[in-house]
């Protein structure tokens, strides 16, 4: 059963936070949604981390007229993986994004204008630093679990290394300890698409630079898929409306990318896209440490990792590198390689493949009372 109508909430922290860059971002607003009820000792809270272009709207609908539920609706609700009769589930929008939390589209209180490119560069660690303040303000000392895929997995890595005493377990899916040169290259091309749109105006646009942002999204979307899934979905079919010898005729896959690119423009801010892409590229779990091993030496919670066989953006070997390091340190870690043809997006599309394993893992954490 899905959750019922949910409402977005927010908190504002007037003192803000000190960022990894050394700058102070203040005030900050954090948008979030919750599902279920926090128990009396606040031991049943699970924080779910969203990916690059996600939001706090994890599940359910925000009004009766909503046509689409939240981005991971299938796993949240009574009797589902994240059972809201048992757990208090939280999802917040990261700072730097554009769905209610402070980002480049927010108003700078010092100028009364949008931050745009005066917004400071942020890191994944900065995002989690803000989340930690939210969790404390909700009266939660220790999270039963933190769970996330892709960029959400990077945030989860920061929780297990920066705040090991604040979590009792963690689930990480389709993530990486650091993006590869290939991943950075794809993001670079996406950035250039926006930079070269004349309507971007170095971030000072009135309306989203639609052509640049649509192309950037299409480039990113390709990295979320796989050759196998694209062959199955599209093959080499031409659009029924386009002739093979029409110069502007399109393959079905082209029409798909065109639709996904331009539909994205209406819901996401171009500058936020750029700032979050920068945060992704900068990410390295060992930043500030001598090595990954030194970072992972801080881990105290049991961990569960998932990789997906056809994910070429953050391929299984990158997860296996982390798992190997953690096991050498004697940490409690599970690893599951899921056979899938869906590429990087498998963590969103094939929850049935990992849900029983995650349920067992969370059941064990819950049985310990979040200790």
UniProtKB/Swiss-Prot annotation:
Binding-site positions, substrate: 217, 345
Q: Name one GO cellular component term.
A: cytoplasm
Protein's GO biological process: homoserine metabolic process; methionine biosynthetic process
Localization terms from the record: Cytoplasm
SUPFAM superfamilies recorded? alpha/beta-Hydrolases (SSF53474)
- Domain AB hydrolase-1: from-to ranges: 44-350
The record's active-site residues are: 150 (nucleophile), 311, 344
Instruction: State which Enzyme Commission number(s) the record gives.
Output: 2.3.1.31
Specify the enzyme's EC class, one word.
Answer: transferase
What Pfam families is this protein classified in? Abhydrolase_1 (PF00561)
Any one Gene Ontology molecular-function term assigned to this protein's record: homoserine O-acetyltransferase activity
Q: Pathway, per Swiss-Prot/TrEMBL?
A: Amino-acid biosynthesis; L-methionine biosynthesis via de novo pathway; O-acetyl-L-homoserine from L-homoserine: step 1/1
Q: Name the chemical reaction catalysed here.
A: L-homoserine + acetyl-CoA = O-acetyl-L-homoserine + CoA
Regions annotated as coiled coil = none
Which of UniProt's keywords are assigned here? Acyltransferase, Amino-acid biosynthesis, Cytoplasm, Methionine biosynthesis, Transferase
HAMAP family per the record? MetX_acyltransf
Q: Which NCBIfam families match?
A: homoserO_Ac_trn, PRK00175.1
Q: Per the similarity annotation, which family is this?
A: Belongs to the AB hydrolase superfamily. MetX family.
Its subunit composition reads:
Homodimer.
Q: What does this protein do?
A: Transfers an acetyl group from acetyl-CoA to L-homoserine, forming acetyl-L-homoserine.
Protein name, UniProt field:
Homoserine O-acetyltransferase
Which species does this protein come from? Pelobacter propionicus (strain DSM 2379 / NBRC 103807 / OttBd1)
The gene coding this protein: metXA
């Amino acid at each position: 059963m899905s959750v019922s109508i949910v409402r977005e909430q927010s908190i504002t922290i007037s003192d803000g936070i000190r960022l990894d860059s050394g700058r102070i971002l203040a005030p900050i607003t954090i948008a979030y949604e919750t599902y279920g009820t926090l128990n009396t000792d606040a031991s049943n809270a699970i924080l779910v981390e969203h990916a690059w272009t996600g939001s706090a709207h994890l599940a359910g609908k925000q009004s009766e007229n909503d046509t689409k539920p939240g981005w991971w609706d299938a796993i949240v609700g009574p009797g589902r993986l994240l059972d809201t009769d048992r757990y208090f589930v939280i999802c917040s929008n990261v700072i730097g994004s554009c769905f209610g939390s402070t980002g480049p589209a927010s108003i700078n209180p010092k100028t009364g204008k949008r931050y745009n490119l005066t917004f400071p560069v942020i890191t994944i660690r900065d995002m989690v630093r803000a989340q930690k303040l939210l969790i404390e303000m909700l009266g939660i000392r220790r999270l039963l679990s933190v769970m996330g895929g892709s960029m959400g997995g990077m945030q989860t890595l920061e929780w297990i290394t920066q705040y090991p005493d604040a979590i009792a377990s963690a689930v990480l899916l389709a993530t990486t300890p650091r993006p590869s040169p290939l991943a950075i290259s794809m993001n670079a091309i996406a950035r250039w698409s926006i930079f070269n749109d004349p309507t971007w105006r170095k971030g000072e646009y009135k309306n989203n630079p639609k052509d640049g942002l649509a192309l950037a999204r299409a480039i990113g979307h390709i990295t979320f898929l796989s050759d196998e899934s694209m062959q199955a979905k599209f093959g080499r079919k031409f659009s029924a409306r386009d002739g093979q010898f029409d110069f502007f005729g399109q393959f079905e896959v082209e029409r798909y990318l065109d639709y996904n690119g331009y539909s994205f423009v209406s819901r996401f801010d171009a500058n936020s896209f750029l700032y979050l892409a920068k945060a992704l590229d900068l990410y390295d779990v060992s930043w500030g440490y001598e090595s990954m091993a030194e970072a992972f030496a801080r881990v105290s919670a049991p961990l569960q990792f998932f990789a997906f066989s056809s994910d070429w953006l953050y391929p299984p070997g990158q997860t296996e590198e982390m798992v190997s390091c953690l096991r050498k340190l004697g940490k409690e870690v599970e690893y599951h390689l899921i056979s899938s043809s869906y590429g990087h997006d498998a963590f969103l599309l094939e929850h049935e493949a990992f849900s029983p394993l995650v349920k067992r893992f969370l059941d064990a954490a819950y049985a310990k009372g979040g200790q």
